[in-house]
């Protein structure tokens, strides 16, 4: 079984069993967005959690080691995403990425926001003109530092 096979089986089983992502996240006591991302193939799932998920979803036990394996992260099928929801994030970063980068540098200095020491949250916010989607990225600041192999800076 490949990771892609496991993901396809997870998606089909979740719908067939009427399970929400929230129910799956609660079953393994993990954050909702992390759980979804993991089940879509972007994080390794601890074996104990994978066993719970496989049982809930009615998958073959051969899915456990596949879910627990360290995945190839960040791969999208095309260079520019074509799914409208995912493309909006691409578009947001095209329009606001430079401004966000400048603000990070002004506030923190020369560095980046980690996507490894990181969490993301998605919330719904009522608004008179239509509900809003609030996405919060919470990443550790990592300063750029030149360090030579011999420890000199």
Swiss-Prot record:
The keyword Magnesium does not apply. Belongs to the cyanase family. This is Cyanate hydratase. It is an enzyme of class 4 (lyase). InterPro entries: Cyanase, Cyanate_lyase_C, Cyanate_lyase_C_sf, CYNS_N, Lambda_DNA-bd_dom_sf. Gene3D superfamilies: Cyanate lyase, C-terminal domain, lambda repressor-like DNA-binding domains. Keywords: Lyase. PANTHER family: CYANATE HYDRATASE. The active site is at residues 88, 91, 114. The gene is cynS. One of its GO terms (molecular function) is cyanate hydratase activity.
